[in-house]
């Protein structure tokens, strides 16, 4: 007969941040006798769930995807934006073999280096600092013909904010004594993601043929003309930038084309127009055989060079459990099921050996303020049964309420959501203690603790950059360590289970057994 297992349970209360101020704080306002007692009587600490500590830009609020990747990886996982910032800062970017190789090949053949991307400080799809670094790389590596094709933002930035960015690049090219802005067009055309190929075609023709609806001597003049036509940045029509006497920047076979967007979804369509031999989105007037480089991998089936391939995570918590012949369960509602499976496993879709999954359907309501408890009762029932089954070495569970109801901005509903969670935590803690298991309670980021924006007085529906609680429930005598972050959770669990921590995990245990 197999011995009943005493599980190590991780409960993630999504959107359950820690904030001292009581005003507009749904977590403070709710009646939470169970969490209050655990915080008062059990080993606990606060951990960081935002900004650089989770691989995001400094002070940027956390999110569920990033949070769960860090929780499962046991190391800080840098997001593309931050990864590139770090690479540029330490100059590794300038030695990137794919980028440098494309520039050298074009330069040695007397060809042009074309750089395209969303010229924006928004940091969502791209960052203009990365594009500036690419211009510098091309110049440093001896390229003479450097053409920048600027896609204008106005969605992740104010609607008319491109002028300062374009000025900066025109000044840079003047200082270098070579290169220029060769075209401008709104992201509405160049970055479609809904197969509106008539839009993409306008951007493609602008790039390949150096033909557009409008022409201007300078990028700033072209932008000002667009504003005079009542076009905001996002909708600027295809504009060729070419002063008298300048050669046109039409693309030729053998040119290098480097796409500086790091986010994939709005980069795929125009990339396929250049790369796919069997492309049929529109009839291309000119097919050019360029040396196309994607900054990151936009899709696995796009066969062209990638400067920064996806970093595969080795020995995440789930993989390490499987390698050590441990059994594990992942359980949540629909809203956060992908987070405790795909994201917690470091972007791996398939379950590991010994990994079971339970999906509880989230309620079918228009918005979750209408049913703030969501499906927490059913989720708790299934979770408690799994804890008592003796089948699992470890269980990962996410309760979505704090986040999903927090997003509605309805304070009364968020309070009810938090109160429902308190009852759930009580049941789970009792079950864990009844079988001699261990329980960690934490969150992936904040939300419900800030329900009103103090600056505007409007409902606050976004995540926060505040810390989140971490509580230990179990029979071990442990001491909490301060200064932790989400990537310390997996090593903490392994340490409490008496298991070796793989060397890839750089996080540190936050509860030390005394």
From Swiss-Prot:
Its EC number is 5.4.2.12. Mn(2+) 2 binds at residues 14, 64, 444-445. It catalyses: (2R)-2-phosphoglycerate = (2R)-3-phosphoglycerate. Transmembrane segments: none annotated. Keywords: Glycolysis, Isomerase, Manganese, Metal-binding. One of its GO terms (biological process) is glycolytic process. Substrate binds at residues 125, 155-156, 187, 193, 263-266, 336. This is 2,3-bisphosphoglycerate-independent phosphoglycerate mutase. It comes from Shigella flexneri. The gene is gpmI.
